[in-house]
Amino acid sequence: MSAEEKKSGRVYDVEPSQLYAEFMKTGWAPSPLHGITPDDVATYAFSRRQALSAAFPGMRLILPSGNYKVRSNDTDYLYRPHSAFAYYTGVQGVEATADAVLVMEPSGDSHEPILFINPRSTRDTDAFYKDARYGELWVGRRFTLEEAQARYQIATRKISELEAFLAKDKGALVIRNQDT
């Protein structure tokens, strides 16, 4: 078993031919989302984050959304984010994606909220059609970083940047058993 197979857990996937891989990256119509407005819950989530910030001054707060729960082999249960994550971000329902993290970064006497997400997989990469967990072909369109920021009124970054961001040790409070 190769390292890639171990990583994905899908040993039955066959590597596509180069011709097929190139074909899958072409011919897709653009699918921009126009007129994204802030979610109605964004105002409430902002107030909740303010109260949370006041309760933990100077502490970095980490609220993971949780991850998928496997039902059988490669079939997952319907995803539901951790309640605290949904409460403080407003991200819920079909817009919620697994493995996201809200970090409340201390900034003076308050906090700066940063939402780390797996952004939309662009169609010019293999992830678009090969990644069964996050690829758009398999699971549908997700928000780009800009779209998520417009929708939830929270600064957003790629989840791949989280580890480096947290490397600056500031002491943190984390909701356990939800982090991946």
Q: Which residue ranges define each predicted feature?
A:
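A composition/biophysics-driven feature that prefers long, compositionally simple stretches
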Residues: M1-T180
